[in-house]
A protein has these predicted regions:
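Feature captures the catalytic ectodomains and active-site-proximal regions of enzymes
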Residues: 1-400
């Protein structure tokens, strides 16, 4: 038996007028997920425990079977694992976004336009991060390049600071959301003229692209301690994801991390390549479990792009789930598949909520026959609620 999780990050949403009162999941054409819904079971799950911020870090730990209340030490340390950052117990790790701010006002009066700097390419971001390292790296502060706009700051023997995620404040004046920790606030402020006038950003502006013109720190945490996934479940696991957070969780859990060329973390990602990576892990590499994470619906939610969010869900269905299902069937391999979001990312607010999300659980050996769709509403109507997200994987493995 093989076990597969397909995680459509931020896929759940609310009814949207532009879609005739439907959610993106309802508006999307998803024949494969609907087929599996008719043959499997539906429900809802609370991946984000009450009182915890509704981040992909907390929610994906839950889906993988780790209680965030016991295993979560911050988002950035998990991301740091994926880029090979060596951490000491007293280090504090931060996510260091490169964001787009307005040009003209004093720093505290600038508006944040884009948390992703137009989804800047990693190669371009590394050029800017090298300039940042030349300016700021020392025995206390060390910057590391991650992926696209997502990078890492290590503060040796630092202090955990309360910080605001930039994607929660798009379109807002930044002053009220800047760090209270003076050294962090000053570093962000000093980064602006360095980045804003960088030749690469001048070229981006000339090409009509968003400048990547300021650092933004958030997601502080300390060295993570995550139980080995194989020891915990008895399964050899593989992670397929474009984003450092998920790769870092996998590194911490001792899972195989599959590299996929063209995996971008957005709607232009290599869906087919991710599907093939999962197929190879399960059928060639001896893995029992594959976790396929797709960031695209979440990014489209943050950007407020309704039609693109619908399209990302359709791509998930036709370009990823369909070939994985077909490969398992052609190989004669029994499998169970869990399909779900980690959290909602509603277009209306362009950020995460901690609400319950729909899930679909399919077992190729125990099929029922029913006409069904996989949507938020059909999952709620199933009246099958799991209040502790970290327990849902037990249903996958035990096929309850």
């Amino acid at each position: 038996m093989k076990y597969i999780v397909v995680l459509g990050d931020g896929m759940a949403d609310e009814p949207i007028a532009e879609l005739g009162g439907k959610t993106p999941m309802e508006a999307a054409c998803t024949p494969v997920m609907d087929e599996l819904a008719g043959k499997g079971s539906l429900g809802t799950v609370q991946n984000v425990p009450q009182g915890m911020a509704p981040g992909s870090d907390v929610a994906n730990l839950s889906v993988l079977g780790y209680d965030p209340a016991e295993n979560y030490s911050g988002r950035s340390p998990l991301e740091a694992l994926s880029v090979g950052v060596a951490m000491e117990d007293n280090d504090v790790i931060f996510r260091s976004n490169i964001v787009t701010l307005t040009d003209d006002e004093p720093y505290e009066e600038k508006t944040i336009l884009d948390h992703s700097s137009g989804e800047i390419a990693t190669a371009d971001a590394d050029v800017l991060m090298e300039t940042i390292r030349e300016k700021f790296n020392n025995d206390t502060f060390q910057f590391y390049t991650g992926t696209s706009y997502r990078h890492i700051l290590v503060w040796k023997n630092g202090r955990v600071a309360k910080l605001e995620p930039p994607h929660d404040h798009l379109g807002s004046v930044i002053g009220p959301f800047l760090p209270q920790e003076e050294v962090l606030r000053n570093m962000m402020k000093e980064s602006f003229p360095i980045l804003n006038e960088h030749p690469l950003n001048r070229a981006r502006a000339a090409a009509g692209k968003n400048k990547a013109n300021s650092l933004w720190f958030w997601g502080a945490g300390t060295k993570p301690r995550v139980q080995n996934f194989r020891e915990k479940t008895g399964l050899k696991g593989a992670m397929i994801s474009a984003v450092d957070l998920l790769k870092g969780i996998a590194v911490g859990a001792g899972m195989q991390v599959c590299q996929v060329e063209g995996a971008t973390g957005s709607i232009d990602t290599n869906f087919e390549g991710k599907a093939q990576a999962a197929i190879d892990a399960l059928l060639k590499d001896g893995c029992d479990f594959a976790y396929i994470h797709v960031e695209a619906p979440d990014e489209m939610g943050h950007q407020g792009k309704v039609q693109e969010k619908v399209k990302s869900i359709e791509y998930l269905d036709s370009r990823l789930i369909a070939p994985v299902k077909q490969a398992m069937e052609e190989a004669g391999e029994d499998f169970r598949m869990l399909i779900l979001p980690d959290h909602p990312t509603p277009i209306r607010i362009r950020t995460h909520t901690g609400d319950p999300v729909p899930y679909l659980l399919y077992d190729s050996t125990r099929q029922r026959k029913k006409q069904e769709r996989f949507t938020e509403e059909t999952a709620r109507a199933a009246d099958n609620f799991e209040p502790n997200g970290y327990r849902l994987i037990e249903r996958l493995i035990a096929a309850e």
